[in-house]
Amino acid sequence: MKKSIITVFLTLLLIIQSFAGENNGDKKYVLVIHGGAGAVSRDIPESLKQEYIDGLNQALLIGKSILTNGGSALDAVEKVVNYLEDHPSFNAGKGSVLTSDGTVEMDAAIMSGIDLSAGAVAGIKNVKNPISLARLVAEKTPHVLLIGEGAEKFADEMKVQKVDSTYFFIRAQNERWKELKKKISEDKKGTVGAVALDINGNLAAATSTGGMMMKRPGRVGDVPIIGAGTYANNKTCAVSATGWGEKFIKNNVAVSISKLMEYK
C-alpha cells in the first residue's frame, strides 16, 4: 500500500497557507496549516486581510525552522498552533469567540502518528495556550481528554501559564458577541490547526479552537475528540479539521479519512 504523506480536511471558507514538500538534504518534510478567524467577510479591509496572511506566514516560518533543523513533527505543530493561539486574529487562544454567556471556553487536541498517543482538553477558560496543555495530557497522564475544572487543576499542577479572563476579551469579539446576542444567532466557523511530516517520516496533528460564536456554555465540538477533528497515524495521514464540529463528530471524519486510506 502506497503511503500518503499528509491529508488535511477543511470545510467552509478559510484562510489557508501551506508550505510543503521541501527537501532537507535527501529527506522531505511537510507542513500544512489552517487559520479560522470566525465569520470573515470577503469585503474586509485589505489591512485586516493582511493581518491574517502575515499571521499565517509567520506561523509557517516557525514550523519550517523546527522541521529544517531536524525537529519533530509534534514540536512543529505545537509551536505553530501556539503562535496562532497568541495571535488575536484567529479563533483560538487570545482570539477565541465568546459563548452565549459572554465567556470563553477553548478546546484543543494534539496527536502523534508514531504510536497514536494523543492528548486533548475542553472547556478551558484561563490557560493561555490550550494546545500545550493538551500535549501534557498526552505525555504526563494515562488519559486522553481532560475537561473544565479538572483540566484547569492539571494545568496548575504542570505550572502551565494562565491568564486572567480579560486577556481573551478583544474588542472585535466583544462587538460581534453583542451583535449576535441581539439576533440570537450562531456562528459555526473557526479553529486553527497544523499537520506535519518530519524528516524522520513521522506525522503529527494539532488543532485548537474557541468553538462557535454564541455556543451554549459547556458545548464541546470536534476538535478535542480524537478521530473526529484531529488524528495522526504514520501508516496513513495526519488530519486537522475545521468546520461545523457536530458534523465531524457524527461522521468521525478524521479517523474515517485515515481508515479509507489504510483499507483501500
Descriptions of predicted regions:
Residues 1-26:
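Bacterial Sec-dependent N-terminal signal peptides
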Residues 22-264:
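Alpha/propeptide regions of enzymes that mature by internal proteolysis
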